[in-house]
């Protein structure tokens, strides 16, 4: 990041120029200069705007927030777009694999969940990871009940099955503050 807008503007122009040397160009809808960081909230309030802008990068949304002590900090969470895509992909995967044995399904599902947690398991993203796990469990319940003409599980039996085939809980793998 840059402390002053003129520095950011100079870098932005230099980047455009450098990329044009190689026949590349910046997508203007995906690149912009935003006020971000320690004073972003104060500056936006002075202009009569509500919250500081956010930006998405590699499936994560970066936003300005405050610590428990009230100090400004930058936080990260799964972007809404990627969250919806991943939930939909998980739903499709569950429906495609509903005919395999429950033990095998749960083993593969555990591996998929851990992979998701490892990529998105960053400081301050625990809530989105928990939401993903919960949505996965809801779809798993629906999928397992569509395996035959009669209902396979009620919610009590399903939670009993989940106690036997434990699904991993979300874990923060990368701390931004170490």
Predicted regions and their residues:
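Non-catalytic terminal/accessory segments
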Residues: 1-178
